[in-house]
Amino acid sequence: MADRIVLNTISYHGHGAIENIVPELTARGYKKAFVCSDLDLIKFGVTGKITALLDAASFPYAVYSEIKPNPTIQNVQDGVAAFKAAEADCIVTIGGGSSMDTAKAIGIIINNPEFADVRSLEGVAPTKKHAVFTIAVPTTAGTAAEVTINYVITDVEKKRKFVCVDTNDIPEIAVVDPDMMSSMPKGLTAATGMDALTHAIEGYITKGHCTISDMFHLEAIKLISENLRGAVQNTPEGREGMALGQYIAGMGFSNVGLGIVHSMAHGLSALYDTPHGVACAIILPTGLEYNKSVAGERYRAVGKAMGVTGIDEMNDAEAADATIAAVKQLSADVGIPTNLHGILKEEDIQFLAESAFADACCPGNPRDTSVEEIKELYKGLL
């Protein structure tokens, strides 16, 4: 079977990349932008860097800011109504995964109104038309939602997150400018950075991995390992390296899937509103230990990309253990907790395990699992 890789039509990378937004919109004849960004980014002037460019060009726009850190069905429905009221014809989404996931769902429903029930988009969505033309501008180095064919929505009523997979939702243009990430606080930088590392590692060991995705993921692991500590300290080199590393990770995992770490993390965010990156970072070492018996021989390449000393002289078991230790060390260095104490409630484990097993990311895990085994993994994280 042939491998399929879906990416943005155009992407811009590097300092000053945002200067290309208005020219791209005007060249295509668009008349009014729907700016999708959250209140904090507006408050701290990050969104203003883009709206200032639109103002300078006298390009009309409307701002939608009703976005939660774990976007809900209601956020999407309100956004669809706001887009229609604004009479916009394109989307510029500015933010992390929450803003971009919200924008993706809005854009899909506007052009595919038969999917107005957001829940109907879960899984591999059978939409017929591409979403509204979108330019995505990430302000975090982690989710890579600007280059993925996935988005995640929280169902508050059912206390779960669901993943939507749709090649029609990928933004036509990604603008990855490290200057847009410089205002991220340390904690958010660490959490989103570890999310990016989880994308790269899970994508590398997933059942669906292929030669092209392997190339992307190993380079992403290298860039993230070399630059996350610096990015947390807000060094220009660290920010630039992470901006590129997280994007390359997205180029890979979007096309081949993830695994049990993400399936377990989604439930924590839905039930407790735990930041997704923090949940992934805490669970990642446990997931690697769990998958070691099936995918451990692939850990050597991960460890090598992370710069583990002497890994070529180790046997497979030693290399796998050294790789897991390197992941734990990086996580500790950027201040991520080592367990779910204070987050996870024992009485919720059955529900969370069932949700994780049903999650769209779970089938890609290299080791076949069960609700009972996932329950034990959660218990081990208390």
Summary of predicted features, one role per range:
Residues 150-256:
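Carboxylate- and glycine-rich phosphate/diphosphate-binding segment that chelates Mg2+/Mn2+
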Residues 74-179:
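Glycine/threonine-rich beta-strand-loop-alpha-helix active-site module
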Residues 1-64:
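An N-terminal, well-structured beta->alpha segment
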Residues 256-322:
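C-terminal catalytic subdomain
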Residues 42-115, 229-239:
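N-terminal small/polar loop signature for handling phosphorylated ligands or for N-terminal nucleophile
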Residues 299, 309-382:
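C-terminal charged capping/lid subdomain of soluble metabolic enzymes
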Residues 18-21, 43-46, 73-76, 99-103, ...:
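Short glycine/serine/threonine-rich phosphate/pyrophosphate-binding segments
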